[in-house]
């Protein structure tokens, strides 16, 4: 589902990758990270499948770049299941629970990560709400808009405010342009154009 915002996660990874290549001081002090994704998409959910394709393509680009081989990696676990989760949860250092506030049902996966020692960063959504109440704000890292704030900002989709953010944030702009400049999948600048268009011009997160 788009509301889980793994698209945002991928853009963040691209921004980190770009900065490692462009900023020697940042690269020298960068703490190595492996980003692990596990997901499925309904057969007819084209945009969700395209996001999975993007995750894998970004992973191929980064994992095969010798300049960052000891700094950043991207892994996608196919057919994510309980059996895979049993191995992943106990090994994770950070649990990213970043769904759009007001969209996620209250599951237990994030609780399992926390109980096994992973630090949780995320939005005030789903079971994060109950976890915050139980562990306190010093033990969970909450960021982003609350559900009512998200609802109030939907009207800005595709407006000049989106374009202003795009224009003023060079790191974000670079990552977005990589979706359509052929750098992720050499020779193809159209594969992820739908994601680029919907983020900038208005219907990201709505049914495709």
Give each language-model segment a name.
Residues 29-33, 69-71, 84, 89-93, ...:
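Short, well-ordered loop/turn elements at secondary-structure boundaries
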Residues 90-91, 98-208:
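Catalytic binding pocket for nucleotide-activated donors in carbohydrate/polymer assembly enzymes
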Residues 70-74, 94, 103-105:
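Extended, charge-rich low-complexity interaction segments
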